[in-house]
Structure formats: C-alpha cells, structure tokens
C-alpha cells in the first residue's frame, strides 16, 4: 500500500521531469526514524546515470511530488528523499489489519502464474531425515507465500520408483521377510539395503500376507518369478511412500500431486522428445544415447538412454519437466539438496530445448541441518541407527520450533540447531518470543472493551517505537511480495521477529489499559493490528499463533 503509493508518486515525477523511468531504485524504512518513515535512493541512482548532483535531482523530484499525500517530504544527504506518513495513511494500514482473516493484496491477474513446486522427492527406499525436513519446510512455505500473492500453486513429489535401487530395496525386504519367518537360506547382497527400513516393510508384509511368499525363489540376487517380483517391488515402494506421507503429515506437509517416474517412462514421453525437440541435440555412442549438454555450458555430455536401452534418471527428469510444462505450468520450481548443484545447468539446458522458457525453470538449493544437544551433534537415530528421522527430530523439538529454526537462515547456509535453546521459555528462544507476543496481545484484548474507531487519534502514536511499528505494519506486504520473487523466506521470519522485539519494548514501557480513553483506544488499535499480522505471518510458515502460554 504505502510502497505502491510512494513508487507511483516517484514514477509520475520522473515522467514530468523527462528523467529515465527504467531505473531500479529502492524504497525502504528509514534506519533513523528522525529522518522520516520511508526513504528512496532514486536521486542517487539517477545521479550516476545523468552525471548530476543527487541533491539537485532530489530537489527537482520533491517539487513534483504531491505534498498533500504525506505529512511531509524532505531531503537528507547524500541523496535520500524521505517520506513522513500522514495520519490518514497510518489509519488505512491499521484498519486493514483489524480483520482477523487478513490477506495480502494479490498480484494483478496478468501477473498471476500457475506454478509447480517440486520438493522432498526422496527415493522410496528409506525414511526421511533432517535434510529432507528442511527441504519440505522450504517447499511448503514457499507454496504458501506464492499462493498468498495470487499464484496458483501445485506441490508435487517426484517418486523415483524406476531402476535398480527400488529393485534392490524390494529384494532386501523379501530376504528380511523370509528371515522374520525363520527362513535363513538367503543372505543380503553387499550392495543391498542393510538398514532397518527393509525390516519395517518386512513386518508389514507379514501382517498383510502372512507366510504367502515363504516359498519364493531367489537366484543371482533376483526374484525368479518376474510377475511376483514386480508385484512385491510395487508393494515395497507403496509401503515406503505410506511411511513418507505419514512423516510429512506429522510436520504439517501435504503434497497435492505424487508423480511416478515409472509412469512417466511408460508414457513414452522421453521417446517423443528424442524424436522431436531433442533430435538435433543427441548422438549415439557406445550403444548409449547422449545429449550434447556441452552446448549449454556443461563440462561433458550426458547419457539419456543407457546401453541396456533403459533411461537414466536425467532422461526421465527431462520428460518429467516437459510434462509439467504441457500440464500448463508457467514456472517450475525445484527444491533440491545442495549436493545436486551440478545438475542445475544441464537440467535447465534440457528444459529450454523442450520448450520451457529461460528463467521459468528454477532451483532452490538447500544446505544440510545438524541438531546439537549440550554442544554436541546428535548423529544417530534411536529408531533407525543412522540418520535422524522425523519421529526422532520431534522428540527433541516441536513442529513449530523445527519450522522456525530450519527457515530463519538463508537456504545457502548450513544450519546447526541447539535443541536446548528451542525448548527455552524466554526471550532467547525466538519462537517462544514471537508466540508470547501474540498471546500477550490476545490477553490484553480480552481485558479491553471493543475498539472505538471514533476515539482513535493517530497523532498520539508519536514515540519512535510506535512510529517504527506502524512502519513495519505498512511494509510487510512489500516483504511478502518480495519473498515471492526471491524465495528468501528467512527474511520474513526476521521481519516478524524484529516487529516482535519492538512490540515487547513498547508493551513494557507504555501503559495501555489504564490511560485516557483516546490513548487507550489508539494503542489498542495498534496492538490488535500487530497481533493479526503476527498471526498471518506465522500462518504462512505453518507455525501456531498461540493465545495462551
């Protein structure tokens, strides 16, 4: 609202002065409230282009701005134009945030996109671990934010159910199943799955089938009967997906679509691409089909079809992205682990070859997570004996805490979470601190009567901390829309935490209920706006805005 108003005023002034309108300039809260509520560096940006004094340009722009739209407009060195909000501006901001079910202003229809965001997508051969949790939270929250600004978003899980790994997992499970039945004539191959996951699925097999498969034959590390092999491989995949879905739901993540790599392969989409869009970019060598990815900047060409005529993961992934494009998605976002960095260039190149516009294939890379207790890393799962699983994680920290601490830093940074800190009930724990602010205001509003807007006098919100909080309230829509473009979700958490700090400072130093009615009503209006904003922003992150603590 306020950002749009300031930008409209500046852009109009630039046109009136015949100054360039294609410049990228900033509008932001002032660091020192004495200089104004918001400022712009437009004069400094233009001074470099026009080779003029920024003070002279700023003066010209200010003369073209409508002074009636703001309390006042000033200049400060080296070239900032400062805007002081009018009481009417503040009232508009605070009144909008009186609505409990508040939502941000949507993008114009022509800017709204259909977006597919694929995340987690772990192989159905093991349980999810900490790295997957951060990936899941990033995808889930990005989806919430993109939907909030008006995009149509589909959350998708790409099931890697094709190839040798799922077959090996099924073989491992069958051998464990036989062992559970007391049949020990088969040993696990060295390259199979020796963890506890096959045992979990084997126990499910006994519940579902009893001893039905006790006579199954295995030769050369393969189930002899191909029909039974296919049935049990699918069974094992489905069981692991069931466990994965359960774990995701336990942390508040629910996918819209689950897409099978096997189904994509069986659709012959990759063959169609090889015969059409990719035909001028492939060649055969050593019995395999290669895509000339070096033309797109890759360090070497990549195999799409192996010598045994089976597709590589890269090949089916190309087909998968093409099918998403055909389904009508304008933007394809992938949340990957940082170890997939090398896949970006070649996948983006293939996406362009198949008709996906440049810039519409997007990758967010997630770094790893470590849990610390007593300053020591928690490395092993009680349940699995290896990586920390989701049930393990939830024994150490709550869903709300895990969401906050996995999202409050840039996704390019590795995270070390001190589980002792996450369980503290004081200001050192940011989750508690923010939730406490919400609960504090809820209690305050419960004690107060309804807010009478006729008795509100916004000129009474004149302390630095009050003006700063109003400015945060006026800024947050801009932050949400910005994150929908940059995907830097951590900046929204930092925003709500900083707002909360200001609130606690204000609450501790300003009396609210025991005041003259005009002051009380005005401060209650501000407090309720802050409460509703905290509630809204926490909802985007899937964190509960508690009312009692």
Curated annotation (Swiss-Prot):
A motif ('HIGH' region) lies at residues 122-132. Coiled coil: none annotated. Pfam families: Arg_tRNA_synt_N (PF03485), DALR_1 (PF05746), tRNA-synt_1d (PF00750). One of its GO terms (cellular component) is cytoplasm. Its EC number is 6.1.1.19. The keyword ATP-binding applies. One of its GO terms (biological process) is arginyl-tRNA aminoacylation. GO terms for molecular function: arginine-tRNA ligase activity; ATP binding. It is found in: Cytoplasm. SMART domains: Arg_tRNA_synt_N, DALR_1. It comes from the Bacteria. It is an enzyme of class 6 (ligase). InterPro entries: aa-tRNA-synth_I_CS, Arg-tRNA-ligase, Arg-tRNA-synth_N, Arg-tRNA-synth_N_sf, ArgRS_core, DALR_anticod-bd, Rossmann-like_a/b/a_fold, tRNAsynth_Ia_anticodon-bd. It catalyses: tRNA(Arg) + L-arginine + ATP = L-arginyl-tRNA(Arg) + AMP + diphosphate. Keywords: Aminoacyl-tRNA synthetase, ATP-binding, Cytoplasm, Ligase, Nucleotide-binding, Protein biosynthesis. HAMAP family: Arg_tRNA_synth (MF_00123). Belongs to the class-I aminoacyl-tRNA synthetase family. NCBIfam families: argS. Monomer. This is Arginine--tRNA ligase.
